[in-house]
Amino acid sequence: MERRSALPQDFREVLHCLKMRSKYAVLLVFVVGLVIIEKENNFISRVSDKLKQSPQVLPEANETEASPVQAENGSLASLRQLDTAFSQLRTRLRNVTLQLAGELGIAAPEPRRHVLLMATTRTGSSFVGEFFNQQGNIFYLFEPLWHIERTVTFEPGGANAVGSALVYRDVLQQLLLCDLYILESFISPAPEEHLTAALFRRGSSHSLCEEPVCTPSLKKVFEKYHCKNRRCGPLNITLAAEACRRKQHMALKTVRIRQLEFLQPLAEDPRLDLRIIQLVRDPRAVLVSRMVAFSGKYESWKKWAAEGEAPLQEDEVQRLRGNCESIRLSAELGLRQPRWLRGRYMLVRYEDVARAPLRKALEMYRFAGIHPTPQVEEWIRANTQAPQDSNGIYSTQKNSSEQFEKWRFSIPFKLAQVVQDACEPAMRLFGYKLASSAQELTNRSLSLLEEGPPTRIT
């Protein structure tokens, strides 16, 4: 036992000798610590064997021989003392090692985070998703649930809507765990030997277009969603899954998860450290953007706005109202801070990102518990001051400070009124002001944004 009490002092002397200004010092400390712990383990093991062989409670001179129960209790008590001493030594080793690492300026490794960017179409999610795609230690996936939507058919509303949400959730859970093989059941044509040339928007993920996932390209193999900056062969899903596990963090962007409550099993999964960022945008701006991007689906809206003769179909308005209500209910759930969402939910307005992209990106990284690299800041500066002609409907390059209010000059006031009537509860929750006239709608000096706390973290 004298050896045990003297050991920490000896260990501090060893550490003092090893206190060099180099990152290798920490490694040496761990090695020394492991050696000491192993020796202590052997020492405890030998003492334990002796304790089991002979009783440790000695009889007094006027007593009879100690009973087997007394002997066993004495052995157990001594073992407990040794176990306590060993635990104290291990704790001291950990504390001194962490202290030395701090003095050397070496940050402790970040725990693995799983970031889910949850949005709806035309809310700027592709742009915001790039904040995480540009981070080298994040494995980023762009809309992988697109394949499920194309393969599994669900009618809107009722039990079918719940069924689709459950399928999306279960696939999402496996993807966050780097089980990319689950997509093979939904990709068309089906992958052969885990190879596919049909993964949706592969080129929107740096992780799928860099070595070793990017394999040599093959002649006569057409890949619709090819990598942007280099030629790669068909995606090897096995290599992609391995790359996902090697990366320190995982991030995924989707517009196909509508109800926040369905994500509770993921938030409570001990294998995941989930962070949910819900991105919202003014529904009037969303409608204008969708009428351009999905022109065929909004013919009735455009015809009514231009001619105004035939009434707008009620089911179209109900669909709009349902979308706004779904977004609002999810946000209200997140802001109520149920136990399973505490510290895991962040509400962000696209307009605030557009006005201050770097500041909002850093806030999102802080919320996720990830340290951004300089490449993220460089990308944001380079891609938020893009020239006007670079703004395609799917572009992630934007002159963001000028773009976020452009919709105000391309929507007829009567169309804005329809949106305001259908989405007023959601607009008030998110801080979007209602326009009372066409003049107010197009007056740039009048802001349609409430300036309260634009970003809310729970």
From Swiss-Prot:
Belongs to the sulfotransferase 1 family. Gal/GlcNAc/GalNAc subfamily. Residues 38-458 are lumenal. The keyword Transferase applies. One of its GO terms (biological process) is chondroitin sulfate proteoglycan biosynthetic process. It is found in: Golgi apparatus membrane. This is Carbohydrate sulfotransferase 3. Its main location: Golgi. Gene3D superfamilies: P-loop containing nucleotide triphosphate hydrolases. Residues 1-23 are cytoplasmic. Signal peptide: none annotated. The gene is CHST3. 3'-phosphoadenylyl sulfate binds at residues 121-127, 281-289. N-glycosylated. It holds the Pfam family Sulfotransfer_1.
